[in-house]
């Protein structure tokens, strides 16, 4: 005689489980140096996706559209035309006091 032992398993997960509870890690985008702030060459000014703010004077653009300072100076956000925003860095002389 042929006998088959068939056991059935639940096809639903049961009470208490949820399909929620995941989220992606934040990317920490945004302005990192405000208008009028002194920055050193290489400092990040804006982290962004796409060019919402374009590079101006003494500002470079990384491959991920991050804007960074190419020279030491003060950050200035400017608007050119109707809808284009630019970030520039203007060099400034800093007096260094010598302790005697």
UniProtKB/Swiss-Prot annotation:
One Gene Ontology term, aspect cellular component: cytosolic large ribosomal subunit
Prosequence residues removed at maturation: 1-9
The keyword Ion transport is annotated on this UniProt entry: no
Gene Ontology terms describing biological process: translation
InterPro entries: Ribosomal_bL27, Ribosomal_bL27_CS
Organism superkingdom: Bacteria
Signal peptide: none
Modification after translation, per record: The N-terminus is cleaved by ribosomal processing cysteine protease Prp.
Record has Ribonucleoprotein as a keyword: yes
Keyword tags: Ribonucleoprotein, Ribosomal protein
UniProt xrefs under PROSITE patterns: RIBOSOMAL_L27 (PS00831)
GO molecular function: structural constituent of ribosome
Transmembrane segments: none
Similarity remark: Belongs to the bacterial ribosomal protein bL27 family.
PANTHER family named among the record's database cross-references: LARGE RIBOSOMAL SUBUNIT PROTEIN BL27M (PTHR15893:SF0), RIBOSOMAL PROTEIN L27 (PTHR15893)
Record-linked HAMAP family: Ribosomal_bL27
Annotated NCBIfam families: L27
Protein name: Large ribosomal subunit protein bL27
Species the sequence originates in: Clostridium acetobutylicum (strain ATCC 824 / DSM 792 / JCM 1419 / IAM 19013 / LMG 5710 / NBRC 13948 / NRRL B-527 / VKM B-1787 / 2291 / W)
């Amino acid at each position: 005689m042929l006998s088959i032992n068939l056991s059935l398993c639940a096809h639903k997960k049961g009470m208490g489980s949820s399909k929620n509870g995941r989220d992606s890690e934040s990317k920490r985008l945004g302005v990192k140096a405000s208008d009028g702030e002194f920055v050193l060459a290489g400092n990040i000014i804006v982290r962004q996706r796409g060019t919402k703010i374009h590079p101006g004077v003494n500002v470079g653009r990384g491959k991920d559209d991050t804007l960074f300072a190419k020279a030491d100076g003060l950050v200035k956000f400017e608007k050119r035309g109707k809808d284009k925003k630019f970030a520039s860095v203007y060099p400034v002389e800093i007096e260094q006091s010598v302790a005697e």
